[in-house]
Amino acid sequence: MTAHTALDGLTVLERGWLSSNNILIHAAAGEPGAVLVDTGHVSHAEQTVALVRHALLGERLHRIVNTHLHSDHCGGNAALQRAFGAPITVPPGNADAVASWDTMRLTHATTGQSSERFTHADTLSPGAHVVAGGRRWEALAAPGHDPFSLMLFDARHGVLISADALWENGFGVVFPEIDGEPGFDDVGAVFDAIERLPVSVVIPGHGAPFTDVAAALARARSRLDGFKSQPERHARHAVKVMIKYHVMEERRIGHDALLQWAAATPFLLAAWRLFGGGTPPREWCARFVDELIGQGVLAREGDQVIDR
């Protein structure tokens, strides 16, 4: 996308899929410093610190705000806190889990992901706002992908930081559905809420900023309808996403070690209990590894599975 004037004063560090995008909102005159939204994966933490330091150009990092606390959005928190001393703001529903560092409630342990403990200074509730870059960013509830997830909306310029609630081509895995809780209707309600907003440009959690919001919503709704009509399709997608994500984190892993990880990961086991059909969990997970290799998303070299 050609640079949009609504993004003036923002630096979007587009990362990929293992790490979320990092959005640096540069300080306007009279503000105490820049605000960073989301910090990527822990395995990229040193790179994130370097990227943020370069983008700051000597400016002070005043605060870090997390849209939600999945491992790909908060993994750089601790490293950035050490490097810049910036306080961290989290959604209120996550505050107790952060304070006690309950990795099960944070979903890092349930999804088999790595994380580094950090401390938070305060919370940002839906309906509250953050002033950064001379803009008023309203926090909007965005449950579905994560029950406590937030979006940030600058109504004056029409900029929506959507996290994983909406990408240009899809949206994040609806984790509650695998845990036996409703989530699809929440996702649809968030789409409806986005449609009612005067959005000119979306900064997603993954992928480049985009302006054709109507087309993105149409694609997302079509995908959601497919998942609602065939919940097993969503579960299969979720399992493959998590396996791919783990291999991205490891870069290369033994086939047996990957299956051992998969068959012991609570989130994948929850999907297996719903749709495994009596197949042993290790064998069931092996099918998804084979599918990912067949699709060219992963590769097999001897006994090693490698990212592609």
Task: For each feature predicted by the language model, list its residue ranges.
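Short Pro/Gly-enriched beta-strand edge/turn motifs at strand-loop
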Residues: 4-10, 108-112, 133-135
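Metallo-beta-lactamase
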Residues: 41-43, 136-143, 147-231
